[in-house]
């Protein structure tokens, strides 16, 4: 039996969204409660370029088993 926890990347808008971290934190808490390992771009440091964020995000997505799309994800710049 495979006891490995599934990893879930949380996709959602950050740039220009006031209090964006609240939605990401709620999603993280929900995923942890369900036994998943969340990967959240909301924990990345501020001040990098969009290209730097994209490289990190793509690596996280590549490492994930699934993606959770938060409301407004389709409007995200990333």
Tell me what each language-model feature is.
Residues 1-78:
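Conserved catalytic or regulatory cores that recognize and/or transform ribose-phosphate-containing ligands
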């Amino acid at each position: 039996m495979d006891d490995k926890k599934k990893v879930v990347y949380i996709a959602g808008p950050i740039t220009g969204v006031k209090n964006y971290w609240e939605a990401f934190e709620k999603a993280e808490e929900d995923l942890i409660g369900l036994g998943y390992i969340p990967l959240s771009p909301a924990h990345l440091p501020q001040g990098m370029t969009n290209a730097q964020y994209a490289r990190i995000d793509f690596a996280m997505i590549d490492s994930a088993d699934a993606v959770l799309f938060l409301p407004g994800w389709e409007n995200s710049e990333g």
